[in-house]
């Protein structure tokens, strides 16, 4: 079936291509020198029309004429959002057109960082916005998130085509586009599945590259934070030329970027203070903030949890000393002050390092005036390194009576006790680095051409392959527990017990002295530290063919259409050396009943593939032109049929229109049905086990629970309905002003989700008195009502299911003003998003929960904040080569929760300010431009926001919302020849 489908697509393309010489010859007499050649026309995958206020005014959107690019007039700008060729005002779906110049002005690091400063992007995953706690998921890169609907529900494109996924989550790292060759980024802020297929639920981000670039561009820049860390360096070069009278066009770029990261949480204010919450989050016991919160069942020396010596701790030499429990704060397992264990902020990173290297090349050749051949290749490598958290055993380390390191007086005090448990933080083991690397290769070849003057066609083949590797240095628990069980051999030497009872197992075992901070030797440390390795290989093959043009003319203009189809195959192959489905060999090992080899990274296998066959049609009909009831009215409709080999056939559609009653006012609206298919990892992943520190409100105990995640082959595509409606204003009475306002309503049914992360499942189950679906995910040894410490949960399920419904509504606002002033140009721009509602229904048995204005929305490890207002306001002035300006990024106030109770539930608004300046030496060869950018000029901290999990494991703020880097300086020079 696959072969026949691909053959039909290729045969159609070949027939069209073979007809080109005759068509070109028959039409040659009708082509004048002033006609636009085919190489200037966008492919069907790139065709669209601008529909934001900025799109109607190229100066507002930052477009300007340069030596190597020519800005089109407003009516000629072509942006993403449709498969049709159209002039500037006829596409009904809202699109933000953001030029590279505007993005790098205030975010010179990467284009994705600049996008994340826009109010419509919320909850994106990046080194600064993600966490460094878990190594079992992708941390490298920048995965964009529109409207906090998830990185999997936004489609990332380059020049209108898909890129190979770069991790196991199905997403694509937006850092890996050729940054120096990107002209603009088109952000579709409405459903676009009818035009682009699966994943375009919250929208589309299309990185548009320079097609006719000639000359050379260079970039050198360095950056550093006000704290003297997180230094960055970027070097890039791009070049373009033509040959054979312009018929052959070559473009290439090479880029290198490195950022050191922030290697210690103590490097930022509050990062070393171990803030956390006390209380249970109920009305009777609300959460309250406390400093220096410690684990009361663990210490750096070894706290004795059970047996006749319970409540005391070890000292060096295996003797016993008193333990100060600190002050209870109404939450089991933690206390303020005392001798309890605290997270060592020096041992874990705040942000990982990041290094990217990129190569890109494109060749375009005009075979005939109406037939073009193109080929492009991109190769990227991204690496990061961080140190997640230190190693500890939270009250569950079993020590046996025959342990050789116990002092004689301790043995005497134990009496007849044969074993007891200890809680210990092993500071001596030190930092445990985790490295991730992504290598990706994308190849795109194709043909495009024209048939007569009204029809265009294109056919292309895309092939991509990515390889994602993680190498985490962690404690091998089988080795660790074998080493802890230290006894005296017959010759009097201290050895691992397993070498006596089971010779040949755990060869080379080095005994560990666990009693007292500093007792672990370097040899023992080196023995227990091993590499947890996992790898993901993604493959993408896609063939597509498109035809578009005009059918016939009506009284108001031509009826436009586009039809096409594509065949896509994607596969994933994930492997690891710590697959939790493979039973551990625990022969001869006492005190360890665990099922995983490593404390943090235990990744199951995932192997699978699916194929997708799609056909689409889109039609645009003009109904009014310069009539008594309006200047213009255009309606647009699209439909797509998609067949998945895993879940069958699904249809998507869109209908919309644009009405211009008078000059300067346009109204637009769309209604669409969109889908997101489950990712290969969501379908085929094996079980992945992670140990997480949680406070169990039922037993009032802090400990380590096992979170089990995996794939679900019964998953089906999510279905969404999207409504957008808005106005675009370009009043002629106020030259230079443009504005837009758009309402959106997105409702997703059968959403794929892990219903609750581990802490949320425990808290919500407890708050509901055991009557919540969250309780079904928790496994306890003694049932759901027993409140003793022995009933601490043994596992918490985190398998994805089609059980959730999500609905979000809001308003996007944009205002721009650009005018000449005092011999220069002033450019003002404001963007804002008003979140009216964000309702999440975890499954049909519970009521929807309103998350707008709170941080209740679950994220991968921590909550995502959803303020009702977010805005970015910028002002820039240019004169005689000098440009300077500033930007304010406003994060509105919000409540900490609408579900849980807090003593202080209100979080005030926070404003971050940025400044930039540049000067271009216009008379110097290369026209070098010196620039400086200062982000977070006032060194503003984010809102104070401790987490409820392990004290001190995270900086006490919401990373998805607030800046954690502090004031940051970037200096550099750009040139073009």
Where are these regions (language model features)?
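N-terminal periplasmic accessory domains that precede
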Residues: 111-114, 142-145, 173-178, 199-220, ...
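Surface-exposed, low-complexity loop segments enriched in small/polar and acidic residues
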Residues: 168, 269-277, 315-356, 360, ...
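C-terminal beta-barrel architecture of Gram-negative outer-membrane proteins
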Residues: 690, 830-922, 938, 947, ...
